[in-house]
Amino acid sequence: MAKYDKADLERRMKGAVESLRGDLSGLRTGRANTALLDPIVVEVYGSHMPLAQVATVSAPEPRLLSVQVWDKSNVTPVEKAIRSAGLGLNPISDGNTLRLPIPDLTEERRKELAKLASKYAENARIAIRNVRRDGMDALKADESKKEISEDERKRAETDLQKLTDDIIKQADEAAAAKEKEILGK
């Protein structure tokens, strides 16, 4: 069992929150956001490449994404990848540029996305709690090896719990903000 390392535990907890923020940024909210297309992979040149490696994505208007494909021969595969990504977007081809109007979300779809945001947040909370458990186990192991006293362990556990609560609060705030954005409240 590894020694208790608060900095490492904090880094891992913050990593879970950053991962949550990344997941949340990929949820469509009815407004153009370039992160929406980040997970799209395009099959070009005989291999699968992220969209960002074959095109430039921008949001020139609040309800429009623009995908500037660098190589004209890749326009069709990029268009196909966007259509098949399940985002409900229909690219409009304009030479090397694909325009993606962002349609309004239906109330039903908004609720689905809000549930998905909640699920992402719960997964982040679980990851954070798992990190806390690892820290608690390390503290108990250190105490059993007589490397720290019982008082030091309890003090460190209290600190770790406070850190966990703070990080979970950050995750909850990120999810709540995204849900509010999705539901348009």
Curated annotation (Swiss-Prot):
GO terms for cellular component: cytosol. CDD domains: RRF (cd00520). GO terms for biological process: cytoplasmic translational termination. It is found in: Cytoplasm. The keyword Glycoprotein does not apply. InterPro entries: Ribosome_recyc_fac, Ribosome_recyc_fac_dom, RRF_sf. Keywords: Cytoplasm, Protein biosynthesis. GO terms for molecular function: ribosomal large subunit binding. Its main location: cytoplasm. NCBIfam families: frr. Responsible for the release of ribosomes from messenger RNA at the termination of protein biosynthesis. May increase the efficiency of translation by recycling ribosomes from one round of translation to another. Belongs to the RRF family. This is Ribosome-recycling factor. The gene is frr.
